[in-house]
Amino acid sequence: MTDPPAVSDLASWPTHRWEDVLARVRALVPPTPCVRFPDLGACYGGDIALKLENLQRTGSFKVRGAISKLTALGPEARSGGVVACSSGNHGRAVAWVAGELDVPATIFVPEWVDPVKLAGMREDGADVRLVGTSYDEAAAAAHQEVQRTGRPFVHPFDDVDVAAGQGTVALEILEVVPDVRHVIVCLSGGGLAGGVAAALRAHGSDAEVVAVSAERARVMFESLKAGRPLELEEESTIASALSGGIELENRVTFDLVRRHVDRHVVVEEAAIERAMGIAARHLHLVVEGGGAVGLAALFEGLLPAEDRAGPTVVVVSGGNVDATRLAEIVTRA
C-alpha cells in the first residue's frame, strides 16, 4: 500500500475537494437530519441540535467513509473485490456500498460482533469471516488476506479518503447550523472526530470539537496523553462500535485528532447506558452505545452550559442495537 497524503493536506484542502467528497457521498445516500431539540436546551442549557447519523443508511456514519474510499479507488482498482475489518458498523457500511457498486467484499469481524450488524453484512452480500475474540485479531486476519490476494484494504479509520468521508458530517452540520460553536463527537480510531475537525477548519469554522471516549474503549484518549499511539487490552463495552486499537503505525488519524480536536472527555459504562435509555424513552431515538457517548457527556454534566456559548451539535453516530437489549435498557432508564 502507498503512503497516504500528508495529514496537513486534509485540514487544508480547498473547499472544492471537500465538495467533491460530499457529492460522491450524496450520490448514494441523502443528508441525515440535524434537528434542534428545545427540551434538551431547557434541561441542559444552550441551543442544542442532534445530527442523527443513527438514521443513516446502514445505521451509522460509517457509510460515508466507505463511499468515499470505494469511489476514490475507481472501477478498475476495486473490480476484484475489497477487504475490510470491523467491530460492526464499518463492516455493514462496506458491505452495503460494495453491493451498490457491484464489488465483492470480504469482511473480517471478531466473534463477539453484534448480531444485528452481522446480519446486515450478510444480507448485503458480503463474505463475512468471524475471527478471534478481539478486533485486533480480526484486523490481523484481514491484513493477511490483503497480502494473499492483493485486494485493496478499506481501513475503518486510518485512511485519508475514509476520514474525509466521515468529515462530510461537518459539512452537513454547517448547512443547517452555520454558526455552530461546539460539535460533540465520539472518539475511537479517530476517523469521525479527526475528519469532522479537519472539515470544519477547512471551511473556516473555529467551532470547538469535543471528542468523547468510552471508559472501556479509550485507546486514542490514552495515546494522545502519551503523545504516541499505544496498544491497550480490549475490554468488553456497551459501546462496542468504539472497540479496538488505533494501530501503533497510525499514519493519519492520530495526528488529525491531536492537531484539530479541542477537548476530550471520557464517559463511564453506566452513563452510556443511561443515555441510550433517555434517548429511547424521551427523544424517541434508537441509539447504540457507541452512538450515545456524546449524549452521555451532555447528560452527565461533563459539558455544562457555561462552557458552551452558542449552538451545540451532538453527533449521534449510530443506531445499530439489538432490540431486546435496548428494551432492557429502557426499562431501567
Please give the residue ranges for each predicted region.
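PLP-dependent amino-acid enzyme catalytic core
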Residues: 1-333
